[in-house]
């Protein structure tokens, strides 16, 4: 099995090294094509107005001056060419990608791009807690990752579907199992704007998530990681809401 590994945190990210370890438990044919720099939050953007710069880091490892989606396209269509990957793994992201995070995430977008190209694709993320990004428990993803991916592949991924996996903020031995969970929803009041002024008196802003408490919905990915379970959430490319489609069709037919 040929595996293409990518991420949105960049070629030097510790989560990428973790995912390479996971991939090598599954196959000895692993290729890495990742962004040259951190591309967190770029979602499914493509570099249409800038050239893509490709740098070979080592054998079967490449860095791209571009987005995660650029990396998947370049990896599949140029680097691997006629012998494309059987699986795209994206991550391991530095921080959870749950609830509406999936709409912003470059990690999810890379898996989405793989799915568009007809390749089985899985996004993996490691949650962090009060200790922040500097205290991520990568061993959680490292220990459980290959087993979860293997089970997903054995179960099967239908065309048009990608799978989002999140590992909880705990030691590997403290994981309370796997939860197949729906995408959750946060209160967007948790998104804060930090207004500042630079040395020349000009305003600038940072977007951040406020550290406020909220109650995650039952059966959601948010609830799963809060309970120290690994969340597995199938996502689909088709964003059509069928009930609303039917309701609108009836309304406009009148």
From Swiss-Prot:
Gene Ontology cellular component list: cytoplasm
Top EC class, one word: hydrolase
UniProt entry keywords in alphabetical sequence: Cytoplasm, Hydrolase, Metal-binding, Nucleotide-binding
EC code(s) of this entry: 3.1.3.5
Compartments reported by the entry: Cytoplasm
List of residues binding a divalent metal cation: 8-9, 40, 93
Database matches in Pfam families: SurE
Cofactor: a divalent metal cation
Entries under SUPFAM superfamilies matching the protein: SurE-like
Cofactor note: Binds 1 divalent metal cation per subunit.
Reaction it catalyzes: a ribonucleoside 5'-phosphate + H2O = a ribonucleoside + phosphate
Molecular function, one GO term: metal ion binding
Main localization (coarse): cytoplasm
Function field: Nucleotidase that shows phosphatase activity on nucleoside 5'-monophosphates.
Entry's family note: Belongs to the SurE nucleotidase family.
Protein name in the entry: 5'-nucleotidase SurE
Species assigned in the record: Methylobacterium radiotolerans (strain ATCC 27329 / DSM 1819 / JCM 2831 / NBRC 15690 / NCIMB 10815 / 0-1)
